[in-house]
Every structure is written in C-alpha cells, then in structure tokens.
C-alpha cells in the first residue's frame, strides 16, 4: 500500500491532474449511464402497463362479443335425392359412410354445400361416367363429438 502512495507522490503534478480528471470523467459517466438506465427501466414499466391495459381491453371485447353456435342440419342420405340427382346407394359405417349418386355435372358442387351444412366432411370422392349418367361416389366422415 505504501508503494502506491510513494508512486503517487513521486509522479509529476500534471500526471496526477490527468489521473484525477480521468477518474472524475469515469465517475460522471457512470452516474449518467445509471440515470439513463433508470429512465429506460421506468419507460419499460410504463410500456408494460400500457400493453397490459390494451390486452385487458381486448379480452373484454372478446368476452362481450356474442357467440352464436351455428345450427347444423341432421344428415340424411335421402336429402340428396333432388332434381338432377338420384340416390344409388348408402353404406353407413361408424366413421361416416359411402354415398353413391347418379347426378348431373351441375349438381356436384351443391352436394358439397349440402354436406357442409350438415357438418359432414368428404375424405374421398370419385366421378365416373356410366352410360349417359355421372356416378358420384363420396366417402363421408362425421365429426367425433366428445
């Protein structure tokens, strides 16, 4: 410890002044950075509070929005006997079933619409020509309700 003091007092006054100025500059810099750090932290806290309020407002909007469950029609293969479509066969299964229709080209898209209204999905389908008619075969799946 005495060596440090001996060195300090042995240096020129100009070098000691430069050391004092350097250490004073370092101290001022640390104080300045510390204050900006506090300002950034306070701004971050305000930002988090603002985000929390916005999320709370969004949750209130979601909770107040009316939830309307769409009513689905019950599925019946006889619903597909319309003009331009004739039911050929229906083979029910636990997962859904297979529906075969003799139909016109124009009736094919409406069959998918009617299935969607009844909450029935199509896993596979095929279209084949039999004479003058179109054989439309659908592999259907009903959703599992639990």
Curated annotation (Swiss-Prot):
What are the GO BP annotations of this UniProt entry? carbon utilization; DNA catabolic process
Q: Which residues form the signal peptide?
A: none
Membrane topology classification:
Single-pass membrane protein
Compartments annotated for it: namely: Cell inner membrane
Q: Which residues cross the membrane?
A: 20-37
Alphabetized, the UniProt keywords read: Cell inner membrane, Cell membrane, Membrane, Transmembrane, Transmembrane helix
Name of this chain's protein: DNA utilization protein HofO
Query: What organism does this protein naturally occur in?
Result: Escherichia coli (strain K12)
């Amino acid at each position: 410890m005495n060596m440090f003091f001996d060195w300090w007092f042995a240096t020129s006054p100009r070098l000691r002044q430069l050391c004092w100025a350097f250490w004073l500059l370092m101290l001022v810099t640390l104080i300045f950075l510390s204050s900006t750090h506090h300002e950034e932290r306070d701004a971050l806290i305000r930002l988090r509070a603002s985000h929390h309020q916005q999320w709370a407002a969004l949750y209130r909007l979601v909770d107040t929005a009316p939830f309307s469950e769409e009513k689905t029609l019950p599925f019946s293969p006889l619903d597909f006997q319309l003009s331009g479509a004739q039911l050929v066969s229906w083979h029910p299964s636990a997962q859904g079933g297979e529906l075969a229709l003799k139909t016109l080209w124009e009736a094919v898209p409406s069959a998918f619409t009617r299935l969607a209204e009844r909450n029935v999905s199509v896993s596979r389908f095929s279209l084949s020509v039999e004479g003058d008619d179109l054989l439309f075969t659908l592999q259907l799946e009903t959703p599992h309700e639990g």
